[in-house]
Regions:
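Stable alpha-helical elements in mature extracytoplasmic
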Residues: 81-88, 108-112, 146-153, 215, ...
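Active-site metal-binding motif and surrounding structural segment of the metallo-beta-lactamase
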Residues: 67-70, 79-133, 230-247, 259-263
Length: 304
């Protein structure tokens, strides 16, 4: 046996393996890092506002549809708008991953109650809402509250495991989005307002990597001021859903502080003629923001 020849053969083989291993290490070292969340980091979300300018009544209904197929619904409007809400959800795939009810007033939760009671081909995975104290609400209820709607809502939620009650200080992540909650029902709410249902509206921020939107339900002016004093810059967002359909006086400082590029106002034609709403629309524009409402040619934005 030629030992020298055999040695050279093994040496050549070893050198080849070493070179290959070195190339592999260099490739791993020089290749761009891929974050663990790469699967959701590239997802974009289209937020769309719905509403009939000639309906003669206010309502609130939004969808947030992800490029990954996930769907989030916010409120939905009146019970007699059920067919439209149902058709909209069906057009987006019929599967609702999160249905968020800002507060159980008829112009926000009516359609949801009907669909949840009889879903048909619509699948609802989770429901998020504020847990309002029944006795406190009953004590301070107003005629516009339509209290039986709240009772219907609570009866439905008492019989399901899909409900997840949320309030101030809660947060979670969903498919790359971050949800932060700043308001909900609180036992100290009547120190700020005795309008229990509106005052308990979920105020939450939905954030992507670069843009965000703040939803405020129907909070009143005093609640908005308290939130700014408590959460400060955490509330600042790219987009805003105007509180209480753009209504109520004393909102200027709130709109100025949030500093949204685009503000959605859920107000049909008749409501936009109300002095407080008209003034708020003027103020938003004077502050440099755009207003999207039921007559706008564009009624959607992208969170990414």
């Amino acid at each position: 046996m030629d030992l020298k020849k055999n040695y050279n053969k093994h040496l050549t083989c070893f050198a080849g393996l070493a070179a290959g291993f070195l190339i592999l290490l260099l490739a791993l070292f020089l290749s761009p890092a891929v974050p663990c969340s790469a699967g959701t980091a590239s997802v974009s979300w289209r937020v769309t506002q719905y509403g009939d300018d000639h309906a003669g009544k206010q309502s609130m209904f939004y969808t947030i549809k992800g490029s990954n197929g996930r769907l989030i619904v916010i409120d939905g409007g009146w019970a007699d708008q059920e067919a439209f809400v149902r058709k909209t959800i069906q057009s987006l795939g019929s599967k609702v991953d999160l249905w968020i009810i800002t507060h159980p007033h008829p112009d926000h939760a009516g359609a949801f109650i009907k669909i949840f009671s009889s879903p048909g081909d619509i699948r609802i995975r989770k429901v998020i809402a504020p847990k309002i104290n029944d006795s406190r609400y009953r004590k301070y209820k107003h005629s516009w509250d339509e209290y039986p709607v709240f009772q219907q809502f609570m009866k439905l939620m008492s019989g399901t495991s899909k409900i997840h009650w949320k309030g101030a200080g809660d947060s979670f992540r969903f498919s790359g989005l971050k949800f932060q909650f700043f308001n909900g029902y609180s036992s100290t709410l009547n120190n700020t307002t005795k309008d229990i249902c509106n005052g308990s509206s979920l105020v939450f921020k939905v954030s992507g990597r670069k843009t965000s939107m703040l939803f405020t339900g129907d909070i009143l002016t005093k609640v908005g001021r308290r939130l700014i004093n408590t959460y400060k810059k955490q509330l600042k967002s790219t987009y805003l859903q105007a509180p209480h359909h753009g209504n109520n006086t004393g909102r200027y400082s709130f709109y100025k502080y949030i500093g949204a590029d685009i503000t959605f106002v859920d107000a049909p034609a008749f409501l936009r003629t109300y002095p407080a709403v008209a003034r708020n629309l003027q103020n938003i524009k004077a502050l440099g923001g755009q207003v999207y409402t039921y007559t706008s040619s564009r009624r959607s934005v992208i969170i990414y």
